[in-house]
Amino acid sequence: MEDSKQKVILQIIPSLESGGVERGTIDIAKSLKKQDFIPMVASSGGVLTYDLREAKIEHFEIDVKSKNPLTIFLNIKKIENIINEKKVDLVHVRSRAPMWSAYYACKKTNTKLVSTVHGTYSLNFLSWQNFPLKKIYNSIMFRADTVIVVSNYIKNYLLRNYKGTFANSVEVIQRGVELQYFNQEKVSKNRVIDLIKKWNLPEDKKTILMPARFTSWKGHEFLIDSLTKVKNDFFCVMVGSDHGHKKFRKKIEQKIVRDNLASKVRIVDAFRDMPAAYRLCHFVVAPSVRPEAFGRVAIEAQASSKIIVATKIGGALETIIDEETGFLVEPFDTEALAKAIDKILEMSKEEINKFGLAGRKNVEDNFSNDSMCQKTIEVYKRLLIS
């Protein structure tokens, strides 16, 4: 890389609401700034833009969330203008709709392009007739100079379902967490007390935390069905944004009442201080019924020295050590999930601490934010000198 000019990196993401992909984008932007790059982010906005402002990182508000073909087409020029005006050296895109715009903008400006595939891009789209169209729509992600995937599960899935020369440009970079941020020793008691008051939590019950946006495959219904079979006393908090899935959230609220769990399960909106939420809880559940590409909650929980219960599919198989840092159960097996929950509720403090220490070490050794950011930045550096 030339030393005479700070390299400008533009990350593009549909929105900056709560979520692992969004936080990862901000983490990399902050790491870039520390390493004398000029980071920028383009999105349709959201609550996490505050983090960018706080870090003095420039944000461009563009409707890159839209899948409307006209909007995608018009965004080509908008991204091209940013590239030219800000002298952007490399663009990193994390979703398909903005990737269509960014691909042509980068092609017109001869700018290096990186994509990150965060999911499997399910191919059973609407009906079998639309399958080829869905595959074409997805394939834009593989036209980048380097394609980053967040787990070996995703890499194997893509190589199995898509053909092309992109196999040589795929790089696995598992996501990471900021170890200090999720260090329970850094979370003050006042933050926890404030949160208990904010959520109006009972102090005489062990709290189960399920951090997940409200969408059907995250497993809210699976967890509720399992909770009806739990023998020990508990209180469960489901925290997350509905991301436009308001009908699904309403369905979950109704199910909680119908299953006589209104006094034991509470839904709260997404909020910023997740380390405090992890500290106040007894353990964490991530009951996805479809494979997670990676599953950031699993490593956040372990970094916070909390036991994690998750389903035995997707990225969880790469992040959780079964019966050492957490427990893995089959999707939809309500008996197994209820049994795992009861087992943790009955554990001694010594057993809980043993799992917590093992989880923290697992993340320190394999899933640190610094490692994830540095591996991503190394990809940028290689492309910028090629």
Question: What is the meaning of each model-derived region?
Answer:
Residues 41, 307-310, 320:
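Short hydrophobic beta-strand element within catalytic cores of glycosyltransferases
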Residues 279-293, 306-307:
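Acidic donor-binding loop of glycosyltransferase active sites
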Residues 144-169, 177-182:
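A short, active-site helix/loop in glycosyltransferases that binds the activated sugar's phosphate group
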Residues 197, 325, 343, 351-366, ...:
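A short, well-ordered alpha-helix in the C-terminal region of glycosyltransferases
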Residues 93-99, 117:
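Short His-centered aromatic/hydrophobic patch
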Residues 322-323, 327-335, 343-349:
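Conserved acidic donor-binding segment of nucleotide-sugar-dependent glycosyltransferases
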